Amino acid sequence: MAMTPVASSSPVSTCRLFRCNLLPDLLPKPLFLSLPKRNRIASCRFTVRASANATVESPNGVPASTSDTDTETDTTSYGRQFFPLAAVVGQEGIKTALLLGAVDREIGGIAISGRRGTAKTVMARGLHEILPPIEVVVGSISNADPACPDEWEDDLDERIEYNADNTIKTEIVKSPFIQIPLGVTEDRLIGSVDVEESVKRGTTVFQPGLLAEAHRGVLYVDEINLLDEGISNLLLNVLTDGVNIVEREGISFRHPCKPLLIATYNPEEGAVREHLLDRVAINLSADLPMSFEDRVAAVGIATQFQERCNEVFRMVNEETETAKTQIILAREYLKDVKISREQLKYLVLEAVRGGVQGHRAELYAARVAKCLAAIEGREKVTIDDLRKAVELVILPRSSLDETPPEQQNQPPPPPPPPQNSESGEEENEEEQEEEEEDESNEENENEQQQDQIPEEFIFDAEGGLVDEKLLFFAQQAQKRRGKAGRAKNVIFSEDRGRYIKPMLPKGPVKRLAVDATLRAAAPYQKLRREKDISGTRKVFVEKTDMRAKRMARKAGALVIFVVDASGSMALNRMQNAKGAALKLLAESYTSRDQVSIIPFRGDAAEVLLPPSRSIAMARNRLERLPCGGGSPLAHGLTTAVRVGLNAEKSGDVGRIMIVAITDGRANITLKRSTDPESIAPDAPRPTSKELKDEILEVAGKIYKAGMSLLVIDTENKFVSTGFAKEIARVAQGKYYYLPNASDAVISATTRDALSDLKNS
């Protein structure tokens, strides 16, 4: 491509020329925005264009328009300009998923993961600009659809306004786009009492939350992996049910809530719980590699948008308007799309081959396939629709590293060919003709059904991928998975932490929730003023109105080192444990982790360093390192459990991990350690089996107490008995054989195990 020479040597003019001449050729046309030439959508495009270009107003009062003239917005206009979705380079899979969500808001939601700067938020906000406006009932708090009176919120029938021709008064508004902030409270999310209106009317008045505003629009959650666990569970429960039922503070109210959920997150800042991702239909990654040309085009179009956004709007105006029309028509055609039973069997078999748990994947995949057909203006699902649905829904949920079930449903074998016999010549000719016609009809039907199902599966019978090009995509999806829950990483209390929600007090109120207290008292202000004789008080709050604050704070972990201080290698083990403890304390300032050291020697164990986060205290306590004597391993583990339980009661510890640095050999019973006077001097020495059974019993109690055990075996491999590994097995903990481990190795091993524990 030749560039026109520039007379001026100014770098600004050179950049402008490069941008205007080169970028339109480098910027690929988005595949998902190209309409098929042959279907009903193309013929109806101009009919619906008028509806897509209507000037509307959002529920928040912000004027918005989707007309052609509005795309040429002056760069000096006040307000934020959102990057158009059609101008995003690459990410065709994510843009296709967003278009599917725009067609069917109840598709199940879309989750986009990716590192910083991968256009996750840009694409989510860009979708809002191509959504067509919606018609709502005037006075509705949840964008009620006039065509669906069964889904209206409570009391809307009493607030309906009518036109002169006795029809319900409606208005056209822009599809809402509601973002959930990370610090959102429960009352702001689901709704609460409107204090001002309740005081005026003398009765409880409901104030809608963000879920009511998002109905029939887009509900966007940025950094969903950092959202409070209780809020995320509440959010997904409401979206799954499609209705928000509020029963609190004297309120009994319900309203529909069926928005399109779009969630984005950065896996480097924390994984998302697998349970949460399973309830989202499409999970895609924005970290897929881009070609050099695409990266150049992306930087160029972003630079052009920052300087002259109106040029970018004009450049993608046709694609944007086409997408708006495509969404409107596809919503109508979706009602007529059918998917056959054989196609459902194909989706189920793909899910079984991929090792997908549950049935949500098949349900979501069937809905995605129907949306793909509706976008193309078809009434039947095709092979391409099925394969695309598997790639978008089932593939990210697959477990490629797991062994699939031994017995899987296989397609039925083809019927055997008819056999010729001499007796056939004696049959009636009419019957033969009828049978031949029936067979030909069945063959035609079978051929038609086979044409609607892919000939090859994406997953083979052993659970592997047939197409190696999809392997990277599946691996990216598996990296995004988190664990089942992280409830113990947060501590709830009434005195310290971040205010998350109000609650009825249990005893004396430590922290008064003023907002919730006023909401509870608001409906009774009018009645209480009438009973007040003095007339001097402005606000009347009684004891029954009191609400306490429910606080939450980050929970630290407690690492308890149980060190064998007996034998000739005791000093080395104690020195390594001391170094590992100091290293962990130096790194635990932000994580609030605590460290404790319990050496066991002689006849009993002692708490040399109680749970602490102070490095100075640890240095002072660990100056004296006692060594030598017997090996009371059972008492050392029992003491660690007692220290852990006491730390849990203090309310500062969420997770507890016991790190046992030992060779697994013990020669002192627990009874001798706890009550030495009860043992007679001439009592026989305990057998090895008795000592081992006692230690294994303590290991089982560690697991039942909810604590994690990490065993670092220091036994010489030439005389190893393997009992240390048995201890870890009974406690369902981790085992490492590190006979000559340094403090750095022990601290690194403990840190990795602690990280896995926090994410479990």
Curated annotation (Swiss-Prot):
Transit peptide endpoints, chain numbering: 1-49
GO terms assigned for molecular function: ATP binding; ATP hydrolysis activity; magnesium chelatase activity
E.C. code: 6.6.1.1
SUPFAM superfamilies: P-loop containing nucleoside triphosphate hydrolases (SSF52540), vWA-like (SSF53300)
A Pfam family that the UniProt record links to this protein: VWA_2
Cellular compartments annotated: Plastid, Chloroplast
Inducing stimuli: Not regulated by light.
Additional remarks: Over-expression of CHLD has no impact on abscisic acid sensitivity.
Function: Involved in chlorophyll biosynthesis. Catalyzes the insertion of magnesium ion into protoporphyrin IX to yield Mg-protoporphyrin IX. The magnesium-chelatase is a complex of three subunits, CHLI, CHLD and CHLH. The reaction takes place in two steps, with an ATP-dependent activation followed by an ATP-dependent chelation step. Does not bind abscisic acid.
Family: Belongs to the Mg-chelatase subunits D/I family.
Annotated protein name in UniProt: Magnesium-chelatase subunit ChlD, chloroplastic
